[in-house]
Every structure is written in structure tokens, then in C-alpha cells.
A protein has these predicted regions:
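DNA-recognition alpha helix
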Residues: 2-15
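Conserved beta-strand -> loop -> alpha-helix junction used to position metal-binding or nucleic-acid-contacting
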Residues: 114-121, 126-164
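Amphipathic alpha-helical transducer elements in NTP-driven molecular machines
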Residues: 3, 20, 24, 66, ...
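Residues that mediate protein self-association or partner binding, especially
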Residues: 10-13, 27, 231
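Acidic/histidine-rich catalytic cores and adjacent linkers
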Residues: 132, 165-286
Length: 286
């Protein structure tokens, strides 16, 4: 959002007149605060880190193109959530994620116990090269959505119910049987919807190694999707942004408002933390 845009919006919406110089001072303060936030020290250990992206239209070399703001949300040892940072990129790649993870490490992160991503290109291999102890889980809800792209509308409800049997199974062995059942029922009609389950099976079923309470935290995406939805709410008036800095500034302000409500640990935290300590006793610093 340019200075003139802010000036016009303040006048039209809030009926407030601010000079160009006053707005420039305010925006410079926001830029400085955003930079300090992005570079702040982080905790040495995060129990879970979710990674996802939200797409915006941004002007780049005279053209308006899609760019993604990638967000990392960490689960701290006190049960609170924290947005670790944001990074703007045109596309995902191993080198891009190497930069993100190097940034987190430089800011103090020594270990991530579990990562949960939308099968982001290059991320799984990169996290394994930097932190081979981390468990990497592909987000199940994103997997369901991706599979449904290949399914016609009238079959989606039934197909989704059959997929639900996979991730609601009591263990990986039963889940594999449910995947076989899904394939037998639908492979003639929707082979590509099932192929992605087969190709990503090991990374889709990491959560079966953990107790039910931790599983639910891993495979649900309500957290990251709610975050993205709230960011959209704050940015819905902008059809496009003039620069990467403008996007980052707007998303930063949105995140600051959202995080004000992140004041309570996630549900059943005492039980869940005890489970983490039993499983990862040598990697958790109390």
C-alpha cells in the first residue's frame, strides 16, 4: 500500500486527514518493527512447526504476478503458538527452503521435533539434510483436498468419507488396508486421486507413530488455515501490492493483530506435553 493509498483510505474510511510526511513516518516505523520481528531470536526447540503459504498478486518489474508469503508457525514448549517468520518467494525449491531453515537456525532454532507441510516442493529433503532427527509429516487435510481435485462433485462426499477411514485408522497397518479398500473401489474411475496417496504414503503416515492427542495436532490444519483466513480478512481490500515490502508490511500488521489472541495453550496441554517428554526426552529442554 503506497503513501497515497493510505492517505486516501484514511480520508474516505476514517475521515481523518494525515499529511504525506506523517504517513511516511508511520510506515517507516512499521517497516522497522517488521524487520526487527523477522530477525528476533527464537527458542532453541519447537515441538511442531507448521509451514504453509498464502498467495498474493504483486507488481514485479512492471508486471503483476503471483507471489507466495510462506509462514512458519511453531508450537512452543509452553503450549503456545508463535509465528516464527514470513518469507516471500515466486516458487518453492530446495534452495528456497534451505534459506528459510538457515534463517531459523541463525536465529537460535536448534531442533524441530515434527514438521507439518503441504508436500512443499523440496522442503522434506531439505529439512532432513539440516535436521535428520525431525519427523516430517505431509498435511493430511491438504492431501485430501488435492485428491478431491480429480473427483467429480457428485462423488466427492463419498470419496472423502472413504479417505477419512485412512487417517482415522487406529494404526498404520489398518490405514494401509483402508487405502487398499479405497483403491479397489475407485481406481478405475479416479486413479490419479489415489496415486498421490501411494507416492507420499510414508510421509503421510508419520503421525501414526504418536499418541492420539499428538496425532490430532499434527494432521489437523485448522491452525494454519484459520491463520490464512484471518490474513485474507485483513488484506481483502487490496487486489494487488506494489512491491514485496508492501506485502510483508501488510501481512506483518495482520499477524500482530492475530497473535494478540494467542494467549492460551492448546487444549489438553498438560497431557500432550507429558507425551512429548516421554517420546523426545533427550531433545526437550525443560
Amino acid at each position: 500500500m503506497s503513501v497515497s493509498d493510505i492517505e486516501e483510505e484514511m480520508r474516505e474510511i476514517y475521515e481523518i486527514e494525515l499529511s504525506t510526511s506523517a504517513i511516511s513516518i508511520i510506515t517507516n516505523k512499521v517497516n522497522q518493527a517488521a524487520q526487527e520481528w523477522q530477525n528476533r531470536p527464537l527458542d532453541p526447540v519447537y515441538l511442531i512447526v507448521w509451514m504453509d503459504g498464502i498467495v498474493f498478486k504483486v507488481r514485479d518489474n512492471g508486471k503483476i504476478i503471483n507471489k507466495t508469503v510462506y509462514l512458519c508457525v511453531g508450537l512452543k514448549q509452553n503450549g503456545l503458538k508463535e509465528v516464527l517468520g514470513m518469507w516471500v518467494g515466486k516458487s518453492e525449491s530446495s534452495s528456497f527452503w534451505m534459506g528459510v531453515l538457515t534463517d531459523l537456525k541463525a536465529r537460535g532454532v536448534q531442533d524441530i521435533l515434527i514438521t507439518c507441510t503441504d508436500n512443499l516442493n523440496g522442503f522434506t529433503d531439505t529439512i532432513r539434510s539440516i535436521s535428520p532427527q525431525s519427523s516430517t509429516q505431509i498435511c493430511v487435510v491438504h492431501q485430501i483436498r488435492n485428491s478431491c481435485k480429480y473427483v467429480v462433485y457428485k462423488d466427492k462426499k463419498e470419496f472423502t468419507a472413504d479417505m477419512k477411514n485412512i487417517y482415522n485408522a487406529p494404526n498404520k497397518e489398518v490405514a494401509a488396508i483402508e487405502l487398499d479398500n479405497l483403491e479397489k473401489k475407485w481406481r478405475e474411475k479416479y486413479p490419479y486421486a489415489i496415486l498421490s496417496w501411494r507416492n507420499n504414503w510414508d510421509d503421510l503416515t508419520v503421525f501414526f507413530h504418536f499418541p492420539l492427542e499428538i496425532r490430532k495436532i499434527i494432521y489437523t490444519t485448522n491452525l494454519i488455515e484459520n491463520l490464512n483466513g484471518k490474513i485474507r480478512k485483513y488484506t481483502k481490500s487490496k487486489l494487488s501490492f506494489p512491491s514485496d515490502d508492501a506485502v510483508k508490511k501488510t501481512v506483518y500488521l495482520s499477524l500482530m493483530e492475530i497473535e494478540k489472541k494467542w494467549t492460551m495453550p492448546i487444549s489438553n496441554w498438560g497431557l500432550i506435553m507429558n507425551q512429548f517428554m516421554l517420546i523426545f526426552e533427550n531433545r526437550i529442554q525443560i
